[in-house]
Amino acid sequence: MSLAEVRHDWQKAQIEALFALPMNDLLFKAHSIHRETFDPNEVQISRLLSIKTGACPEDCKYCPQSARYDTGLEKERLLEIDKVLTEAKSAKAAGASRFCMGAAWRNPRDKDMPYLTQMVKDVRALGMETCMTLGMLSSEQAGKLADAGLDYYNHNLDTSPEYYGDVITTRTYQSRLDTLTNVRASGMKVCSGGIVGMGEKATDRAGLLQQLANLEQHPDSVPINMLVKVAGTPFENIDDLDPLEFVRTIAVARILMPKSRVRLSAGRESMSDELQSMCFFAGANSIFYGCKLLTTPNPEENDDMSLFRRLGLHPEQGPQANIENDSALLAKASAKQDKSTKQFFDAAAL
């Protein structure tokens, strides 16, 4: 009988019981499921680029990009497509199979869409999977991104419904669920997870995973972030989470969503190699690669590759792993750009 049963009817008490298992029992269960559904030594690598930084109107208490907090972050306008392509090419050459683009918006404006869809098309021409995180999406906007070929859309739930109001007040939990519905209906793959270490209780971590696991279809990718405390944000002095509770969250996510990629996301820069190793054993099989995640630090690429070698892990090969034709692909992508790229850029500016 398969251990990797896909369910959408998890009760919170059942999830809390998993969290309460002795660590050895929890890790054994999670790793057994992980080994049944994935190559246990393969890790999918994504690169995340901030294509528009700062000045976000939302009040997420963890976020240095909120315009409501003085974090010293300088706002930047939307990046030109050629700069995005340069970063995407570099990411692919470094071993990333997916390129994620994030903008600090509540939601994209309709006049931004032609520019964003062109960006998607040009990055895909390099032979990479594409992902964007732009805030809330209407069904029409989701459809346009899907038509452009966007593979994944990220929109995190952040935490449990019960704790959500302590984290953010400018966007409802239901609006996040609605965006996920719009993304899934468009045919794109869903990337959705949350953040732990924000002062929530263990029952909130269970509640977050319950929401994700009980979606009509599990997210294809589930990023689990450890809070990165940033000076100037309301959460800068919040108590640290026990690292073993982070491992438990990874393990339970693997059990509840056996066929989803579980991404070891923000916060790795402060994690020991030993802690990351436990997370990989518990079922994490995706990371963000590169020295920065939007505006927060991330391990250096060489450090990640060194850890992979020591653990016997290897990167997942992307849809076009052979990079010999990168120059031709990049030239093709550049040639496909609309001659009015500057017009697109001006229209999408702050």
UniProtKB/Swiss-Prot annotation:
<dbReference type="InterPro" id="IPR010722">
    <property type="entry name" value="BATS_dom"/>
</dbReference>
<dbReference type="InterPro" id="IPR013785">
    <property type="entry name" value="Aldolase_TIM"/>
</dbReference>
<feature type="binding site">
    <location>
        <position position="60"/>
    </location>
    <ligand>
        <name>[4Fe-4S] cluster</name>
    </ligand>
</feature>
<feature type="binding site">
    <location>
        <position position="131"/>
    </location>
    <ligand>
        <name>[2Fe-2S] cluster</name>
    </ligand>
</feature>
<dbReference type="GO" id="GO:0005506">
    <property type="term" value="F:iron ion binding"/>
</dbReference>
<dbReference type="InterPro" id="IPR007197">
    <property type="entry name" value="rSAM"/>
</dbReference>
<dbReference type="InterPro" id="IPR024177">
    <property type="entry name" value="Biotin_synthase"/>
</dbReference>
<dbReference type="InterPro" id="IPR002684">
    <property type="entry name" value="Biotin_synth/BioAB"/>
</dbReference>
<keyword id="KW-0093">Biotin biosynthesis</keyword>
<feature type="binding site">
    <location>
        <position position="63"/>
    </location>
    <ligand>
        <name>[4Fe-4S] cluster</name>
    </ligand>
</feature>
<keyword id="KW-0808">Transferase</keyword>
<keyword id="KW-0411">Iron-sulfur</keyword>
<comment type="function">
    <text>Catalyzes the conversion of dethiobiotin (DTB) to biotin by the insertion of a sulfur atom into dethiobiotin via a radical-based mechanism.</text>
</comment>
<dbReference type="GO" id="GO:0051539">
    <property type="term" value="F:4 iron, 4 sulfur cluster binding"/>
</dbReference>
<keyword id="KW-0004">4Fe-4S</keyword>
<protein>
    <recommendedName>
        <fullName>Biotin synthase</fullName>
        <ecNumber>2.8.1.6</ecNumber>
    </recommendedName>
</protein>
<dbReference type="GO" id="GO:0051537">
    <property type="term" value="F:2 iron, 2 sulfur cluster binding"/>
</dbReference>
<feature type="binding site">
    <location>
        <position position="191"/>
    </location>
    <ligand>
        <name>[2Fe-2S] cluster</name>
    </ligand>
</feature>
<comment type="subunit">
    <text>Homodimer.</text>
</comment>
<keyword id="KW-0949">S-adenosyl-L-methionine</keyword>
<feature type="binding site">
    <location>
        <position position="263"/>
    </location>
    <ligand>
        <name>[2Fe-2S] cluster</name>
    </ligand>
</feature>
<feature type="domain" description="Radical SAM core">
    <location>
        <begin position="41"/>
        <end position="268"/>
    </location>
</feature>
<dbReference type="GO" id="GO:0004076">
    <property type="term" value="F:biotin synthase activity"/>
</dbReference>
<keyword id="KW-0408">Iron</keyword>
<dbReference type="GO" id="GO:0009102">
    <property type="term" value="P:biotin biosynthetic process"/>
</dbReference>
<keyword id="KW-0479">Metal-binding</keyword>
<feature type="binding site">
    <location>
        <position position="100"/>
    </location>
    <ligand>
        <name>[2Fe-2S] cluster</name>
    </ligand>
</feature>
<comment type="pathway">
    <text>Cofactor biosynthesis; biotin biosynthesis; biotin from 7,8-diaminononanoate: step 2/2.</text>
</comment>
<dbReference type="Pfam" id="PF06968">
    <property type="entry name" value="BATS"/>
</dbReference>
<feature type="binding site">
    <location>
        <position position="56"/>
    </location>
    <ligand>
        <name>[4Fe-4S] cluster</name>
    </ligand>
</feature>
<keyword id="KW-0001">2Fe-2S</keyword>
<comment type="similarity">
    <text>Belongs to the radical SAM superfamily. Biotin synthase family.</text>
</comment>
<dbReference type="Pfam" id="PF04055">
    <property type="entry name" value="Radical_SAM"/>
</dbReference>
<dbReference type="InterPro" id="IPR006638">
    <property type="entry name" value="Elp3/MiaA/NifB-like_rSAM"/>
</dbReference>
